[in-house]
Regions:
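Contiguous, often N-terminal, cationic amphipathic patches that form binding interfaces
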Residues: 1-75, 79, 91, 95-109
Length: 109
């Protein structure tokens, strides 16, 4: 049996699309945050929620764009999305989250 010091180590790379999916699924767990094609994103075939991610080693910063259903409290939904996204990134990616900015791109009725 190999001792821990003799086992070869490797690298781990998680594709940005996986990180985006984690963020998307996290955001959609928040009541009032809904899936929606909006603006230019709809022309590109992208739906909200959507994330733009910046990584630097173990550090992640995310901009999350969401749609909120009317009459949900917009500010509370955005705060909850920020908290849930941070929690999911830390739990599922073992990442050190430096920032999560949430942008409400549209309200649905």
């Amino acid at each position: 049996m190999d001792s821990p010091s003799s086992i070869a180590t490797g690298s781990l790379r998680i594709e940005q699309s996986v990180t985006n999916q984690i963020i998307r699924q996290a955001a959609l767990t928040v009541p009032g945050c809904v899936e929606k094609a909006a603006g230019v994103r709809s022309v590109l075939g992208k739906t909200l929620p959507q994330a733009d991610i910046t990584t630097d080693g173990p550090y992640i910063a995310a901009e999350v764009h969401i749609a909120v259903s009317w009459p949900a409290p917009v500010a509370q939904v955005a705060r909850s999305v920020r908290e849930v996204v941070r929690s999911h990134l830390e739990a599922y990616m073992d990442a050190q989250v430096t920032e999560v900015s949430v942008f409400v791109d549209t309200i649905t009725t």
